Amino acid sequence: MTAGASAFEQALDQLGAAIVGGELEAGAADTIEGFIARTGASRSVVREVTRVLGGLGMLSAGRRVGLRILPIDEWDLLDPRVIRWRLEGPDHARQLAELRSLRHAVEPAAAAAAAREIRDGRGSTRALDAAANSMVEAADGPESGAFLAADRAFHAEVLALSGNAMLGRLRAVIEEGLRHRATVERGEQAPDRHDLGLHQEVAAAIGAGDEARAAARMREIIERATAAR
């Protein structure tokens, strides 16, 4: 939970994590009053939280059954909040594996598509090159947040350059995985120099319109991140 979070954010995180963690089991019924007692939040806050959780497919509301917790196959598993709750809960290993598989399927293809777009005269790698260079600069600095911001910008730009709007919508999913890797898995460890070089190679391959090399280098980035876990 983020420091300084509002009462709404705290209650949402608490209930979302409870559903993901199985404290509130699929099929179980509850009430607004029960959620108020669990979170200590006001009725208006809890009502808003239940609307959000309903939108995420995590619970349903009905006059006779009250609030009912829904199973995981109903959840919006691509929402970054759901991803974060799963990464921070007992299901974290499964969520990491699913993120890894998603990145393997999506990012090399996005890098290849970006190279094709650039080769065909659509788009510019200026922002991508800047993000790759910022990663190198931030790796030497004291502020780890700057490195994460540059890393997120790099991967988001690859998706954007692909020319595929649907791939672009996966930006928040990829970013949540990068955030977890930077803040939880890597912790205080300095960024790997070889990985930094690979990011620059991806940018160079995209700029040169080399689909195969862009995909291969992006695949290597993901595989190295997986092996480091």
Label the predicted regions.
Residues 129-136, 155, 168-229:
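C-terminal all-alpha effector/ligand-binding and dimerization domain
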Residues 95-102, 124, 131, 147-150, ...:
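Amphipathic alpha-helix face/heptad-repeat signature
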Residues 18, 137-141, 159-161, 205:
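Hydrophobic side-chain positions on well-ordered alpha-helices
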Residues 107-139, 143:
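Exposed, interaction-prone assembly regions rather than primary DNA-binding/catalytic cores
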Residues 1-105, 112, 116:
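Short linear motifs at protein or domain termini
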Residues 32, 142, 163-165, 209-210:
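Short loop-to-helix capping motifs
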Residues 102-120, 149-189:
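Hydrophobic, amphipathic alpha-helical faces that serve as interaction scaffolds
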